[in-house]
Amino acid sequence: MITFEGVEKVYESGGQKVHALNGIDLHVDKGEIYGVIGFSGAGKSTLIRCVNFLEKPTAGKVFVGGRDLMSLSKAEIRTVKRKIGMVFQHFNLLNSKTIFANVAEPLALVKTPKADIKKKVTELLRFVGLEDKARDYPDQLSGGQKQRVGIARALATNPEVLLCDEATSALDPQTTGDILKLLKRVNEQYNITILLITHEMNVAKEICDKVAVIEKGRIIESGSVFDVFSAPETETAKSFVKSAIDHEIPESIQKLNLKHLYQLQFVGESSGKPFLSQVSKRYDVEVNILHGTITELQGIPFGSMTVELQGEDGEIGRALEYIRRENIRIREV
């Protein structure tokens, strides 16, 4: 649905060339929720703005729905952009207009008949849970309600793609969760492809199918949410994952200088097995649990535990082999 091929974006600043995007290759399948995560200045916003041509790439190709935007005329680009909705960080609502008028704005701009506008806007306000706010104004709404209006407005033209630019970063955690659930409903009910950029790994963890990590204008790691969260490869990805799932041993434990420390990662059915008690029963090994966490990734239980194994080296070795046979990943700390 969305493809970047060798995309570059270069700005001139003080006589110097600044590469905001540097050789971006990325593919988002139709109906997917794809997250791009990175720190401030990594190139996230520039990347997403290339999809609706608010930014024109310096080099490379951007395909939306199979069409290369770089080869289209201005009129053709306008046609493609009508199938792309956008949700902004700070809502971008018109304060002088009612909620109904804000959602209706994209339809009014293309001279949609008034009866069709009323029907569509009413449907969308009902969908986002704000049907009773149609006559209100933006300053009468909470932040979460304003973002619901922004989502309804973005859906007004029946887009095939929805771009979300830090759509939850101005919201509190509870409201963030509500907005993410709404975006998931948008994806499922309307079969809309969502490209979402964020600096919050928890956002990607909650609703994305796949995620890419961007740093200094380059994609440094990408894959399914499960793969990136369970086995991050780069230091930047590890840092983001740590913010959502803390695998690290507390510093107070590290100071004890314990031996035979192992991090165990278990997935799916193995998450519910009492394998540690079995280790103690089968082998002359004591298990000291130092740290642990369990969460869900794409509906699959995923846990991590740091343990100290106490006993003779031979017994510890046999215990580790047993744990591996239970399909549990082991990493010596």
UniProtKB/Swiss-Prot annotation:
ATP binds at G38, F39, S40, G41, A42, G43, K44, S45. One of its GO terms (molecular function) is ABC-type D-methionine transporter activity. It is found in: Cell membrane. Keywords: Amino-acid transport, ATP-binding, Cell membrane, Membrane, Nucleotide-binding, Translocase, Transport. Disulfide bonds: none annotated. SUPFAM superfamilies: ACT-like, P-loop containing nucleoside triphosphate hydrolases. Its EC number is 7.4.2.11. It is an enzyme of class 7 (translocase). InterPro entries: AAA+_ATPase (IPR003593), ABC_transporter-like_ATP-bd (IPR003439), ABC_transporter-like_CS (IPR017871), ACT-like_dom_sf (IPR045865), MetN_ABC (IPR041701), MetN_ABC_transporter-like (IPR050086), NIL_domain (IPR018449), P-loop_NTPase (IPR027417). Belongs to the ABC transporter superfamily. Methionine importer (TC 3.A.1.24) family. Part of the ABC transporter complex MetNIQ involved in methionine import. Responsible for energy coupling to the transport system. This is Methionine import ATP-binding protein MetN 1.
